[in-house]
Amino acid sequence: MSLTTATKSFGPVRAVDGLTLTVPRGQALALLGPNGAGKSTAIALLLGLIPPDSGRAALFGLAPERAVRQGRVGAMTQEGGLVQRVTVRELLSFVSGTYPAPLPLDEVVALARIGDLLGRRVDRLSGGQAQRVRFAMAVCGDPDLVVLDEPTAALDVEARREFWTGLRGLADQGKTILFSTHYLEEADEQADRIVVLGHGRVIADGTSAEIKRAAALTTVRVTVDGDASWLATLPGVRHMEIRAGRAHLRSGDSDATVMALAHAGAVRDLEVVPADLEDAFVALTSTAPPTVPAPVAATALTTTPAGKENA
């Protein structure tokens, strides 16, 4: 699937600004960004729900609407409604009947883990149960591409864990998966690749490890006797805080910082804490200005698995 220099505005607000994004088949991609970054608009463009003002969207080399009609795409959007006053089984049977080659119902039920809900009326589902049914509807057609917009927003911790178990089952079958989420640990654990949007543009694109290395700082913690102000001048150190007698050094080159500390010999209880995805996300989204190119170049981080063609 791909977006090519896609632009979309709503009145004076440019939600997507010249966005280019290509996803190979079989990849699980997480789309991240703060509120208003353009995630939902980008997904709507890919699905053909709204047309771009300029640029192009394509799924499997086809116009999105055509790929959707062929049953190659399953989507779970934030606003997806459910038919009321029918049972879950009746709803899924109806949805399956709209596809030329649907996934067997027992497989849908197993993937979504909704076996205990089949006899329940849709209008009596909890928010989390309704989300699981929406996921089941998204995979009824045995799609090649599954698009999920904030899929675990209404789920508790255990339900989220079960959801991702089911989704990884799809990924293991070679399905392409695109999801947006505010739970950064989900992106860290589940995505082969992460794209961070800001002001409708790509500001970072790569694996979780690549983005963390490129965008975030490692924390070096030490206990030092006496005046600690000199620690701020060590190689790599960009920020220092003293908390409860320990210095917390935010370093862009932790190896150089640690070597300098070891050479000084005046420190103890040395601890190096690698950056996590949340650190990188905050660094990227708090510094990316709306009108200049991204500080972390997508071309420098993008990794496309060998031999994979685009979805």
Task: Tell where the protein language model's regions lie, with residue ranges.
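Catalytic Walker B motif of ABC-type/P-loop ATPase nucleotide-binding domains
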Residues: V146-E150
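ABC transporter nucleotide-binding domain
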Residues: W164-S251
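Conserved ABC ATPase "signature" region
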Residues: S93, G97, L103-L118
